[in-house]
Each structure stands twice: as C-alpha cells, then as structure tokens.
C-alpha cells in the first residue's frame, strides 16, 4: 500500500512540474509569471519554454579625483546626490519649521533645485581648494584666472547653458574691490604685497553658486581678512526667513568696524564699503531684485522662504566707498530689456552670439575671444548704449587702500538654512 501510494504521488508531481514548464515562465528571482504566449502555443500543439533574461547593467564605479582636479563630478558622485552644505536651524521664532511635516514635504519637492546648487557648490569647493594650493606671487593674472576657470569647466562638465561658469572670475587687487578680470593683453603680475579678492561663480541648470574669498601673502593684512570673514559669518547668522535686510546690514557693519589693522606702521579702522552689498540669486540671473546691505539704514524688506542669497561683505582701509574705474571687462545681457531695434548688423550678430552662449549670465571679453569672436568692441558698446547689455566696470576705493571680500551662497529652505558653499577653508 505504501509503495503504490508513493508511485502515484511521484507521477502526480511529475505531471505538475511538466504543466508548470509548459504554461509558466520562471523568473530569475524565483517568482512565477503566467505566460499567455505559452498557453496559445499549447492550444496549437506548440509548447515553448520562456525565461526572462537577467539585466546586464553594471553598477557604475565612482572615480577618484585627480591632482590637478580634472574628473567631472558626475563620475565621482555616481548616484547624482551631491554633498549638503552647512545646515543651520532658524532663530527661535521659526524653529518650528525644522520638524513641521508640511514644510519637510515641501523641502523634498525642491530636491532637484537644491541638488543642482550642491553640485555647483562642490565644484566651487574643489576648484578653489586647488587654486589656493597653486596660486603664488609671480603668476600673471591671466594664468590665475585660466587656472581657476579651466578647473571649473572640467569639474562642472561644461555643457552650454546646462552647466558651466556662472560669471567671470573676479581677481580684483588691493584698492579694487570688485569686477576686475584681465582682458586680452593684460600683463599684470600678482605680487607679494597684493591683496586679491577671488570671486568664483558656478552654475548648474542656471542655479548659481556665488562665493568669494581673499588671498594675501603678507601677514600684516590678516586682520583685514579676519574682519571681513567675521562680518560675512555674522550676515549668514542673521539671515533667515522673515529676517529684515536693514537689520542684517546693521549687524554686519557692527562686526566689521570693530576691527583695526596695522599696515606699514599705520593703523586703520576696517570700514564696510557702504555702496556694495549682497543679493538674491534667480535662475540664470546673478542679481535678483533684493539687495543685502552691509551697513545700517537699508530697506525694511524681509527675506522669504525658498529664496537663495549671496551674503557678501567688503571691508576697506580707505574711504569705504567705491567708484567705477579702469577698463571694463564684465558684461551681462539685461533680462527684461525687451525688443530694441538695432541698426548695426555686427551688433545684431553679436547679440545672437551672447544669447546662445551666455543667455543672461554675466560674461567677459575673454569669453568672447574664446568662442572665436573678434573685432567686437564697437558692437558690444553699441549693445550697452542701446540698453540691451549692462556693463560692469571695476569698482575701486581710493588708490593706496586695501579691500577684502568674503561671500557665501545660502538657501532658505522651508525647514532650515543651508550655507551651500561652506567649506573647510571658509
């Protein structure tokens, strides 16, 4: 009896296995999937066994950065998630935002925008770290900017208006506080006694990271740099949702002007440069509609949720006021200029070139040279005079004075504040 039952069971098991093979597909992960094609084949007397193929995709292996840095960040961060900056809670009135579930959900919705900024910020950190290690007195200013910009282009994997340099690299020296980058033929050499502001911009999908630092090679300038760095950090500390811009400016000035610096045996109070300021950043637009003053007396406008700001401060041993001086190098297409008729054919052609290559991002003459433009100065000046392109000449305090700058980009998340460009250096 036992033997007969075993034989019947074995036959039954065999029949079930055959039935399974004829009518189903056994997947690699052990799941069984009904196969209509096999059933149709069975009705026609054609029974086929089908098996799902394994995916042949290989996991990407992250590359390591080279020295000098040349590997694009997408090859290092293969999961496309880039490092988060310094995260700070808001002040007490807004501390509830940190744990509010609705605000956290809103924050998650904006991940792509934040990730673009974080990618740009990581490019900035790596580019400036390399720059600080190789820039030395005796280099030409042209070599300085080429070192920074070539590194930036490689790391951000420059791709037209999708990713690239956010604005011309500023390397303003001594009494010149901002908007100097060398034009073709500039033979200026970086000297041991120079104070150089290094202002670097990186963008990804138009999301701009704007961050700056100051380099000096003589310790007598250390207190000037310390004053400006402390003032910038105070501005970052005071910034936040509902923070009033005028109150931020007052706090910055108080810290800045508490410092003194002795240069060549003469003591100077460090002054906030009152006609320079920080600003909000819009997509593809370096200066949005809001300005963050660095002295008291600004507008009583509030910062708002979701805004992105460049908090930057400038200190000077001079008058604390800048004026336009020297040859212009920086330009940008005005976003809301509208259609303005141009009579000069060369100006029309140059405008098309600017629109295709830079959009509303700032550019400089070197960038026009780089893409093959020549004999364009008359046309460029025509675009400026027509109100289509804005020129940004160098901004200088009195000669013989020294100026310094530090700057960070911050994101006002619904939940917290992120200093996205923060690094170990500043």
UniProtKB/Swiss-Prot annotation:
Binding sites annotated in the UniProt record for substrate: 179, 287
InterPro entries: Creatinase/aminopeptidase-like (IPR036005), Met_Aminopeptidase_Type2 (IPR050247), Pept_M24 (IPR000994), Pept_M24_MAP (IPR001714), Pept_M24A_MAP2 (IPR002468), Pept_M24A_MAP2_BS (IPR018349), WH-like_DNA-bd_sf (IPR036388), WH_DNA-bd_sf (IPR036390)
Renumbered residue ranges of the record's region Disordered: 1-72
Taxonomy, superkingdom: Eukaryota
MF terms in GO: aminopeptidase activity; initiator methionyl aminopeptidase activity; metal ion binding; metalloaminopeptidase activity; metalloexopeptidase activity
UniProt feature, compositional bias: Basic residues: 47-60
Residue stretches of biased makeup (Basic and acidic residues): 10-34
EC nos: 3.4.11.18
Catalysed reaction, written as an equation: Release of N-terminal amino acids, preferentially methionine, from peptides and arylamides
Amino-acid positions noted as binding a divalent metal cation 1 in the UniProt annotation, renumbered to this chain: 199, 210, 407
Plastid in keyword set: no
Gene Ontology cellular component terms for the protein in this record: cytoplasm; cytosol
Subcellular location: Cytoplasm
Family from the record: Belongs to the peptidase M24A family. Methionine aminopeptidase eukaryotic type 2 subfamily.
Record function comment: Cotranslationally removes the N-terminal methionine from nascent proteins. The N-terminal methionine is often cleaved when the second residue in the primary sequence is small and uncharged (Met-Ala-, Cys, Gly, Pro, Ser, Thr, or Val).
HAMAP family: MetAP_2_euk
Protein name: Methionine aminopeptidase 2
Biological source species: Schizosaccharomyces pombe (strain 972 / ATCC 24843)
The organism's taxonomic lineage, starting at the top: Eukaryota, Fungi, Dikarya, Ascomycota, Taphrinomycotina
The gene coding this protein: fma2
């Amino acid at each position: 009896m036992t033997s007969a039952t075993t034989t019947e069971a074995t036959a039954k098991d065999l029949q079930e296995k055959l039935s399974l093979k004829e009518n189903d597909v056994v997947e690699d992960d052990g799941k069984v999937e009904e196969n209509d094609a096999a059933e149709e084949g069975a009705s026609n007397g054609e029974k086929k066994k089908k098996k799902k193929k394994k995916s042949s995709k290989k996991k990407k292996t992250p590359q390591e950065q080279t020295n000098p840095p040349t590997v694009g960040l997408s090859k290092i961060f293969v999961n496309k998630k880039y490092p988060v900056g310094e995260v700070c809670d808001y002040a007490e009135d807004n501390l509830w935002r940190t744990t509010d579930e609705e605000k956290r959900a809103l924050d998650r919705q904006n991940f792509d925008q934040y990730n673009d900024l974080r990618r740009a910020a990581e490019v900035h950190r790596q580019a400036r770290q390399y720059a600080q290690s190789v820039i030395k007195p005796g280099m030409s200013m042209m070599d300085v900017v080429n070192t920074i910009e070539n590194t930036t282009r490689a790391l951000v994997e420059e791709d037209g208006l999708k990713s690239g340099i956010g604005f011309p690299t500023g390397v303003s020296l001594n009494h010149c506080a901002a908007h100097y980058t060398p034009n073709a033929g500039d033979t200026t050499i970086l000297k041991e006694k120079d104070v150089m502001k290094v202002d670097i911009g990186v963008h990804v999908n138009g999301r701009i990271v704007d961050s700056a630092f100051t380099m000096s090679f003589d310790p007598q300038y250390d207190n000037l740099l310390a004053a400006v760095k402390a003032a910038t950090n105070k501005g970052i500390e005071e910034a936040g949702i509902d923070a009033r811009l005028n109150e931020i400016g007052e706090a910055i000035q108080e810290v800045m002007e508490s410092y003194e610096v002795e240069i060549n045996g003469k003591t100077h109070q460090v002054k906030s440069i009152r006609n320079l300021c920080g600003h909000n950043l819009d997509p593809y637009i370096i200066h949005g509609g809001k300005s963050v003053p660095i002295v008291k007396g600004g507008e009583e406008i509030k910062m708002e949720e979701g805004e992105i700001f460049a908090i930057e401060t400038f200190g000077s041993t001079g008058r604390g006021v800048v004026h336009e001086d020297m040859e212009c190098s920086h330009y940008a297409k005005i976003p809301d200029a509208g259609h303005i008729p141009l009579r000069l054919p060369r100006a029309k052609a140059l405008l098309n070139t600017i629109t295709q290559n830079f959009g509303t991002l700032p550019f400089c003459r070197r960038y026009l040279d780089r893409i093959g433009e020549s004999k364009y100065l008359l046309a460029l000046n025509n675009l400026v005079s027509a109100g289509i392109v804005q020129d940004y000449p160098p901004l200088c305090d009195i000669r013989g004075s020294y100026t310094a700058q530090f700057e960070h980009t911050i994101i006002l998340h619904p939940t917290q504040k992120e200093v996205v460009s923060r690094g170990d250096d500043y």
